[in-house]
Amino acid sequence: MRTRAGMSEENPCPRNIFLLCKQYGLELEDLRLLCVYCRRALSDADVLAFAIKELSVVWRKGFPFGACGKCLIAAGKLRQYRHWHYSCYGDTVETETGIPIPQLFMRCYICHKPLSWEEKEALLVGNKRFHNISGRWTGHCMQCGSTCTAPDPASRTLH
């Protein structure tokens, strides 16, 4: 196993943010990461969101990187435009995968948060489509879904 200076032999580049903190003896609130996309420092809120979303730490030249919220959304949109294959309803996803929707691991295609059972259920009950992007099934979380379906303020009429 290859090792890098100052890193343990057991896991030189932990991809989980909590394992990274443990390996270096840091608390999550003391961790400082740069965004892999824009190279700016992640705010405390960005680090916490990165952890909650269970995203993987990216290593470049021996240094760990995360992703800020703005870049995650931009990267999600780019992935959606470049790698969208098709969209379909839940029963089709279950038929194609052979796995019930509640058991499938899915992320929000906008913010990348893992979808909860309730969010998947809301998509099924609301007869919303799931999207195959980069070969993975995705949907939208409740937070991003509400922003996607909110009426356009410009289209409101005055009474």
From Swiss-Prot:
GO cellular component: host cell cytoplasm; host cell nucleus
Keywords, in A-Z order: Activator, DNA-binding, Early protein, Host cytoplasm, Host nucleus, Host-virus interaction, Inhibition of host innate immune response by virus, Metal-binding, Modulation of host cell apoptosis by virus, Transcription, Transcription regulation, Viral immunoevasion, Zinc, Zinc-finger
Gene Ontology MF term list: DNA binding; zinc ion binding
Assembly behavior: Forms homodimers. Interacts with ubiquitin-protein ligase UBE3A/E6-AP; this interaction stimulates UBE3A ubiquitin activity. Interacts with host TP53 and EP300; this interaction inhibits TP53 activity.
Family under the similarity heading: Belongs to the papillomaviridae E6 protein family.
Note: Belongs to the low risk human alphapapillomavirus family. The cancer-causing human papillomavirus E6 protein has a unique carboxy terminal PDZ domain containing substrate but low risk E6s do not possess this domain.
Record protein name field: Protein E6
Organism the protein comes from: Human papillomavirus 27
Lineage of the organism: Viruses, Monodnaviria, Shotokuvirae, Cossaviricota, Papovaviricetes
